[in-house]
């Protein structure tokens, strides 16, 4: 029996409001995170991911109050990320009601933090978020590099090797965003999604670039992802979660 593939709406939150931009810029307001999360819960989303996109850049801690409000009204797994730098940050988020915590920039600067977090809280609640950009030129073997700070700072780290290292350190899941595709609505970067999914034994969530329901299906069928994440197609009413599930089922994908 194939494991069901998950559909995960993503809330990018800036100063307490859900926003969506193109390649992390040109931000437009999509509403109150708690109301939006409740709507997705009612629609049958498998999980919700809440990313405080101001936290790492401005050094602000994720709004625990918003997480508490959301967790009190949403009864599906909630992953929270943004500005997570210490074991205490993780403990605070889990205590506020998060089921999983996503570590991004801090993992790059201190990889052992991932191992410490997994040992302390269990791999099942530690997600490592990877922002990858293609750095190979035309005709070269495809290669992707890790970027931090909302895709602004290159690290020199190979994305596939980095993902494997994170798995070895105890990450329970990888949230993979293609910075080339983010907000562009022309589909996931299936090359990096497949390369990382095939290299790892833990689930990989594909993110960045969904513009239609076929893109979600392609993330699973061609990208080999365990879950697919999308934001704007759901926030602005183009598609509902039930429509996405029905479409994926029609493509032969097992959904919950």
From Swiss-Prot:
The keyword Cytoplasm applies. Its main location: cytoplasm. It is an enzyme of class 4 (lyase). It catalyses: 5-[(5-phospho-1-deoxy-D-ribulos-1-ylimino)methylamino]-1-(5-phospho-beta-D-ribosyl)imidazole-4-carboxamide + L-glutamine = D-erythro-1-(imidazol-4-yl)glycerol 3-phosphate + 5-amino-1-(5-phospho-beta-D-ribosyl)imidazole-4-carboxamide + L-glutamate + H(+). It is found in: Cytoplasm. The keyword Lyase applies. SUPFAM superfamilies: Ribulose-phoshate binding barrel (SSF51366). InterPro entries: Aldolase_TIM, His_biosynth, HisF, IGPS_HisA/HisF, RibuloseP-bd_barrel. GO terms for cellular component: cytoplasm. Its EC number is 4.3.2.10. Heterodimer of HisH and HisF. IGPS catalyzes the conversion of PRFAR and glutamine to IGP, AICAR and glutamate. The HisF subunit catalyzes the cyclization activity that produces IGP and AICAR from PRFAR using the ammonia provided by the HisH subunit. NCBIfam families: hisF. Belongs to the HisA/HisF family. This is Imidazole glycerol phosphate synthase subunit HisF. It comes from Pseudomonas syringae pv. tomato (strain ATCC BAA-871 / DC3000). The gene is hisF.
């Amino acid at each position: 029996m194939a494991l069901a593939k998950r559909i995960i709406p993503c809330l990018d939150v800036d100063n307490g409001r859900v926003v969506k931009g193109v390649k992390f810029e040109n931000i437009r307001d999509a509403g109150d995170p708690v109301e939006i999360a409740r709507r997705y819960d009612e629609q049958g989303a498998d999980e919700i991911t809440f990313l405080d996109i101001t936290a790492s850049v401005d050094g602000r801690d994720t709004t625990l109050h918003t997480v508490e409000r959301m967790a009190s009204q949403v009864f599906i797994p909630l992953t929270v990320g943004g500005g997570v730098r210490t074991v205490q940050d993780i403990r605070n988020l889990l205590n506020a009601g998060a089921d999983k915590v996503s570590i991004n920039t801090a993992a790059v600067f201190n990889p052992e933090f991932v191992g410490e977090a997994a040992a302390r809280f269990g791999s099942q609640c530690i997600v490592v978020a990877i922002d990858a950009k293609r750095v190979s030129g035309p005709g070269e073997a495809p290669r992707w590099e890790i970027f931090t700070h909302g895709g602004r700072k290159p690290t020199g780290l190979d994305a596939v090797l980095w993902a494997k290292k994170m798995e070895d350190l105890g990450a329970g899941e990888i949230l993979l965003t293609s910075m080339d595709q983010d907000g562009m609505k022309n589909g996931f970067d299936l090359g990096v999604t497949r390369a990382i999914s095939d290299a790892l034994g833990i689930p990989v969530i594909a993110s960045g670039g969904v513009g239609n329901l076929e893109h979600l299906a392609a993330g699973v069928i061609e990208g080999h992802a365990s879950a697919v994440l999308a934001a704007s197609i759901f926030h602005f009413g183009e598609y509902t979660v039930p429509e996405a599930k029905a479409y994926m089922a029609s493509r032969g994908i097992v959904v919950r």
